[in-house]
């Protein structure tokens, strides 16, 4: 006795593919007196760390947060603070407490987004001018 097998083709709906996560770029700049091309600052004088977060096509990222940290080379540092990104930028006040080279780092993140984290850093040399802010 022969057994006949029947095949039924059932169309299957594919799950939609998640959008590929983009990786923004993050650059850090410092403003304040006398930060300039030499990247010098005075101990105890206020500066502002500015993170610029953009997509590869130059579009500013409009959501997420940036965490800023500061440390001296070879020494653990501290979190300066976490601030929201608005129109591609996040900024926070920073005051060097001691003389020396300070590494200011920033990490962009957004848990509710399809964007990957991004990071960057810059180095500032703080000089002790006995409280004089130039």
Please annotate each region the language model reported.
Residues 1-134:
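Solvent-exposed beta-strand/loop surfaces, strongest in extracytoplasmic domains of secreted
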């Amino acid at each position: 006795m022969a057994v006949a097998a029947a095949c039924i083709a059932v169309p299957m709906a594919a799950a939609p593919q998640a959008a590929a996560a983009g990786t923004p770029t993050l650059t850090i700049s410092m403003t304040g007196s006398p930060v300039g091309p030499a990247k010098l600052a005075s101990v105890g004088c206020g500066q502002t760390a500015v993170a610029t977060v953009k997509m590869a096509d130059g579009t500013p990222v409009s959501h997420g947060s940036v965490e800023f940290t500061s440390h001296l080379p070879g020494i653990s540092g501290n979190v300066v603070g976490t601030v929201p990104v608005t129109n591609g930028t996040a900024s926070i006040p920073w005051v060097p407490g001691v003389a020396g080279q300070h590494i200011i780092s920033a990490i962009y993140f957004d848990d509710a987004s399809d964007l990957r984290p991004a990071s960057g850093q810059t180095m500032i040399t703080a000089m002790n001018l006995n409280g004089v802010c130039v």
